[in-house]
Amino acid sequence: MTVSSDTTAEISLGWSIQDWIDFHKSSSSQASLRLLESLLDSQNVAPVDNAWISLISKENLLHQFQILKSRENKETLPLYGVPIAVKDNIDVRGLPTTAACPSFAYEPSKDSKVVELLRNAGAIIVGKTNLDQFATGLVGTRSPYGKTPCAFSKEHVSGGSSAGSASVVARGIVPIALGTDTAGSGRVPAALNNLIGLKPTKGVFSCQGVVPACKSLDCVSIFALNLSDAERCFRIMCQPDPDNDEYSRPYVSNPLKKFSSNVTIAIPKNIPWYGETKNPVLFSNAVENLSRTGANVIEIDFEPLLELARCLYEGTWVAERYQAIQSFLDSKPPKESLDPTVISIIEGAKKYSAVDCFSFEYKRQGILQKVRRLLESVDVLCVPTCPLNPTMQQVADEPVLVNSRQGTWTNFVNLADLAALAVPAGFRDDGLPNGITLIGKKFTDYALLELANRYFQNIFPNGSRTYGTFTSSSVKPANDQLVGPDYDPSTSIKLAVVGAHLKGLPLHWQLEKVNATYLCTTKTSKAYQLFALPKNGPVLKPGLRRVQDSNGSQIELEVYSVPKELFGAFISMVPEPLGIGSVELESGEWIKSFICEESGYKAKGTVDITKYGGFRAYFEMLKKKESQKKKLFDTVLIANRGEIAVRIIKTLKKLGIRSVAVYSDPDKYSQHVTDADVSVPLHGTTAAQTYLDMNKIIDAAKQTNAQAIIPGYGFLSENADFSDACTSAGITFVGPSGDIIRGLGLKHSARQIAQKAGVPLVPGSLLITSVEEAKKVAAELEYPVMVKSTAGGGGIGLQKVDSEEDIEHIFETVKHQGETFFGDAGVFLERFIENARHVEVQLMGDGFGKAIALGERDCSLQRRNQKVIEETPAPNLPEKTRLALRKAAESLGSLLNYKCAGTVEFIYDEKKDEFYFLEVNTRLQVEHPITEMVTGLDLVEWMIRIAANDAPDFDSTKVEVNGVSMEARLYAENPLKNFRPSPGLLVDVKFPDWARVDTWVKKGTNISPEYDPTLAKIIVHGKDRDDAISKLNQALEETKVYGCITNIDYLKSIITSDFFAKAKVSTNILNSYQYEPTAIEITLPGAHTSIQDYPGRVGYWRIGVPPSGPMDAYSFRLANRIVGNDYRTPAIEVTLTGPSIVFHCETVIAITGGTALCTLDGQEIPQHKPVEVKRGSTLSIGKLTSGCRAYLGIRGGIDVPKYLGSYSTFTLGNVGGYNGRVLKLGDVLFLPSNEENKSVECLPQNIPQSLIPQISETKEWRIGVTCGPHGSPDFFKPESIEEFFSEKWKVHYNSNRFGVRLIGPKPKWARSNGGEGGMHPSNTHDYVYSLGAINFTGDEPVIITCDGPSLGGFVCQAVVPEAELWKVGQVKPGDSIQFVPLSYESSRSLKESQDVAIKSLDGTKLRRLDSVSILPSFETPILAQMEKVNELSPKVVYRQAGDRYVLVEYGDNEMNFNISYRIECLISLVKKNKTIGIVEMSQGVRSVLIEFDGYKVTQKELLKVLVAYETEIQFDENWKITSNIIRLPMAFEDSKTLACVQRYQETIRSSAPWLPNNVDFIANVNGISRNEVYDMLYSARFMVLGLGDVFLGSPCAVPLDPRHRFLGSKYNPSRTYTERGAVGIGGMYMCIYAANSPGGYQLVGRTIPIWDKLCLAASSEVPWLMNPFDQVEFYPVSEEDLDKMTEDCDNGVYKVNIEKSVFDHQEYLRWINANKDSITAFQEGQLGERAEEFAKLIQNANSELKESVTVKPDEEEDFPEGAEIVYSEYSGRFWKSIASVGDVIEAGQGLLIIEAMKAEMIISAPKSGKIIKICHGNGDMVDSGDIVAVIETLA
């Protein structure tokens, strides 16, 4: 619908809410405003309409409309542009509240809560309506503003007290009006005006801002023309408000949606009509039509309810009315302004005493007991809304009596805590309407609306119901349609669950994952059986089967609603043989549910559990049965770490056994430590010092009273001496005896035992003691042979030897490994069987001669004899052979009286169908989970039970293998670097939650090089092998581990290989497997090479998190566009000198930006073009000859995790990109696989020459800037601004991604100092900088770039706009810059042309900086200004701060908490309104930086909105705000803090007033002692005013006590390094450094880290600790304690002391006033001579600095020219050198060995030459990229 300029409000008369919304959506903003203005004009005409008390002004309407228009989501708002009226006892800001009493009138400072909610929903308030004075009456005639007549008759009353609201809705002026209802005022007017009157459940609408009538009973009510509008407003207004309304309460979470079809409705047995004859007819007809809905209508005696009703006016509740206006009445208001009837009623309260009050309350409670009994079997009450349609004259004749009769059926409702809905009953024969009221129990509001709808369909058939006065029109069917409570069947699917998905059971999390809503618990129809299916995994599954009624039962189930869009995700988690079908409920309704395939309930082991009536009862029976089992052990110690320790603890918890973990120093924070009930430190680092130290383990068991020790696998699990030691100590070893371990654990003796058992053996030797003997035996066996450590395991201590030349080295290596890892150097040899498969049998023995095989596993896929992927059952294995294998294992176990778990390993020759004994592992195997998955057994539980001599009966145990299970081992190793160990800190970890994942790692886990590299075992179960392969592939695709390199890509390549699909496996197949990684490798890192994305990390500038991203975004975007990537795809930024990169996969690349020699395999390649790269090619990007940065785009991007929404690297914060750092030598970057690559957008394309950035060849640049935020004449003199643009600025050598420093003319300041902001004229109170701001740090400008700080205290003269920032990214030290002024419009034009040109690759669309764009002169940065209104509404200055920012500055240059609060109010308003175009609000001390999206809102449009918002912000000095009190430990002047100061003195500035000690400086300039500085720090409470003061959530905080605000100064120049956690004082401000960063505050101590990078702490939802208005306190701790706390913080276990609180400004002002004398004295002491001395001190220091700055550079070691630096490619422990300083070596010759994760890695010489330095000694830790040696190359 559209409207012309001459349209009047008449067209909108009678519109519903939806009509209004449809109009606004289909009309222009101008048309919408015109119609609203027309409506307002139509009410401002003579004669005066008594329904209104006040109407808004045109200005107010425009203001409301402007704010509505600014909202981004306005068209989705439920009341978008809908005009509403409000009863004049409800506060509306901008209109007086009178309560119909002129002398009572006041101007509210804010909206009532309900009005606020309606405005938030898009409503426009048009006026306040008339009422019975002080809402006392049901007639609508008790008002000095006139009597409001019925909408149908001027002679009849409208009903009260909400008369005006009913009138304006009935006449269609507005579709909705608010009333209030204490005793019927929201219902009686509805009946008399043909309306819907909704009186909600008491307390669900806030009464904040409502003039009370009876506060304990008051309800805000809704008048509407239709049910839909009433429900819509109910949903909006139904919000708890406990902070502002004492009677507020939340709505129930699952309210009744509808009454049953045979709902029981009670009507009064006796109805007094007081002589009325027409209304009984209407009521009787209404009741009859209710019956036709199927309702069961009964008559009851309403006397208890009527007795309750009489209490309202005959009891002490009238005293509430008196209390509400007592102070007003005491002020002796003019009598003529008071309604005599109302006042006489209210003053009747004076006769009651406090005793009477309690007496009547007791009486009410007694009556309520009768009412509860009366309503026990009743769902709904139906009563006449009011018995009469009184005339004005009748009311005048009997004002109290008529009023009293009208409340007959309304007065009791709120006293009884009931909900009510008044609805029309039709018209009398005299044309007047009346109605009925449906009354339900509390929280039945939705059901009452639905019942009313049913009633309407009967009483007004075929859509014949009229509304209000519109008797010739009918309500549209859509306008009586209801949504109901939040569960919406149109967007959800009802699902019945019957098994492990029930509440509290193991799979309930799956329902939570898909956001399912619980609806009810019910039963099936009598046609079902329930089965418990065979358990083939950790979770017991049910099978629901439909049968004939005579054979079936009712089964209990729970019903949920699942969002349709997530239903597929839920189905994907349903395991076979279950599926989704339908089930019939006892109500007859059919809904979705689980069904079971016939194979499920017919499978062996299926149990019919129908008799239990439901799965939960059966589950509880099993739990009870389980708990009655024999008690095994009270406490068990796990002598292990990692995933196996975690897995064992799960079983111990299930069995109710107390678990004890032991841990090394590196494992202090590991999961097994936190999961266990008790944890004991072993105090050591290496395995030998900890997990292999038998004495420590046994001591820990004794210390914790552990009765048993379970060793897992590895470490001491197969150590016979340990088993014996446990036995000697009286501790049960969960495993076989020492003798058995000794016999089987040593592989040579195990062969002898197997031989006795008749098991076929591979030809081999006994133990060999020398290399010579090894050579002899190997020759006899014939090569190839296997060299094996007799004590080895897990792939460690066995290697293949192909020829005699290798035997010596490998023999010594295996011997060393056996001794190092297993404490046994014994070695023997076996013949190597070509193409053998490794098949093993899981064995359990009871220790008394019985043994049982639990199936076999194929573990043939091995690399370096380390298993990679295992599966069960073994594929391609004849059943006869399978049984023979199992039988051989059982025989061996029985022969030995084997106890607990063991694995008998065989070599299987598939070609010959023969197997040979390999060895017995006398422990639990790594791959045991796949056996558990197919058998449903818990092998750890079996071990525990067997160890406790409570073994299962093997004779009766039937082990059935169901389906296929596979396991892939995820290792921290680099498959591109020969699987070298890859330790590191895991920054992101995601595993599929539908698969079984046995792991010990999570985000934040530190992978140590000390131990096995296993991260996780990913286990799946399928119905067959193909299904298992598919699931394992899916699980691997969903697995994401970042922070260290893993073998995940390698595993995926194997799983998807042809040989694996066909099960063509052998133990050596991976030796020849051609793994083709999807990765690139850094072989030379370049000067500063990092991963970035565009637009970077948006939305966290206010926190101090810079966006990072590319310095030259234009070139970066071109690179992605050329290769066909989405613009957000991560790519590589190169600075000055580029990297060399080996591509291990085929792809397409593009290099853009600065010019450099780029070669591919030595051949030069072009820039700015797509280039195809072959697998194995090497890309080299040389030194940039023009520009500073180049960009490498790779098709599909790079697989790195997002951090705070971006892939970009922020090196100072150590976040984003690749491990939060620049790329180093040896880094391997994986590229997304085809399955997960969503970055590719189009095909690669060439770009036109005209799009290539024009990088200066002359080193001279012209860069456009916008003026401001700070300019002339308030900060700079005009000539200084002119000079800024006329002079050329040289780029300083100290320029980088944090900022580009400039050298040029000294600014001419317009002021002598920065006032409160600081001593220098460049200083100001901390505010948030714009990206690209030219920031004057003193007299030296620096351009804030993408990694720069956000919050600071220096003025900014100009800002480089977004389109020109690319140039800043390309300037080099020594280049010169000429700045030119641009307007906002020109800046936006440049930006938009860039965007269009890049997207279209059309060079003609690109606009470059030219003379047309440049302003003739600089402009004022002040865009607008609002003058001061009062102290709480100060002057506001809107400053231009670039082309995407506006800086809003409040008041004078002083810190003021009221200003801070005003800023907070503005931020909250923008957030609430979701204001169009605003990206982020960043708070400073007295300003807020607003970032906006120029595509959504222009600068001018934004200014209009911001100005409008200012008038919305109203508060007084008594404001309160949520504030956390954060108490932090601080070590005063700890060594690390003092080291920062010393480093500064040694490297930056040797002398300054604050040197050598910062605390002494603070004490001296303030004339106090060091102790007083100390006392201040630990007694002050600091208020946080902003974040990012340096970086990453660092607070800018001020002491609340003015006496703690000392004189002071920041460092000049700043420090280049500040320790993380350092606490600084800068004048009146305090800062905590969140990262190792530059800084300038005076350092006083150190606290814990305040940036939780990975959100590891349980309380961390975001990385930053503080928010504005939080309060910080410090308490003293020692440095030693602080270091411990810091370590705990870094591992997420430290709990910060945070107290939830409220900062009460009124209370604070009282405290200030109570201490004003001492505060004044302190402040005066800082002025005068002291201030002058301080200023002079700083001035002299700055002068000295200019004259001479002593900078001592860091010492650098001098190596000969051409020396070759050798870097480590991995992290580990330096084991030993294999060459010495002075040795002459050849290229490729080994230099040294690094030991990491049980592997020895040789670092070889890259070139020939003489070793001149080895940088490490034995035992040193070495990080990847560290220098390890230096070689002097020889000619």
Swiss-Prot record:
Task: State its cofactor.
Answer: biotin
Q: Name one GO biological process term.
A: urea catabolic process
Q: Which CDD domains match?
A: biotinyl_domain
Cysteines engaged in disulfide bonds, as pairs: none
Q: In which pathway does it act?
A: Nitrogen metabolism; urea degradation; CO(2) and NH(3) from urea (allophanate route): step 1/2; Nitrogen metabolism; urea degradation; CO(2) and NH(3) from urea (allophanate route): step 2/2
Tell me the residues on which Phosphoserine occurs: 803
Q: Kindly indicate whether the keyword Kinase belongs to this entry.
A: no
- A Gene Ontology cellular-component term: cytoplasm
Query: What EC number(s) would the UniProt record show?
Result: 6.3.4.6, 3.5.1.54
Binding, ATP: 122-129, 747, 830, 865
Catalytic activity, per the record?
urea + hydrogencarbonate + ATP = urea-1-carboxylate + ADP + phosphate + H(+); urea-1-carboxylate + H2O + 3 H(+) = 2 NH4(+) + 2 CO2
Q: Which residues form the Biotin carboxylation domain?
A: 632-1075
Function noted in UniProt:
Hydrolysis of urea to ammonia and CO(2).
Misc remark for this entry? Present with 952 molecules/cell in log phase SD medium.
Q: What is this protein called?
A: Urea amidolyase
Naturally occurring in which organism (per UniProt): Saccharomyces cerevisiae (strain ATCC 204508 / S288c)
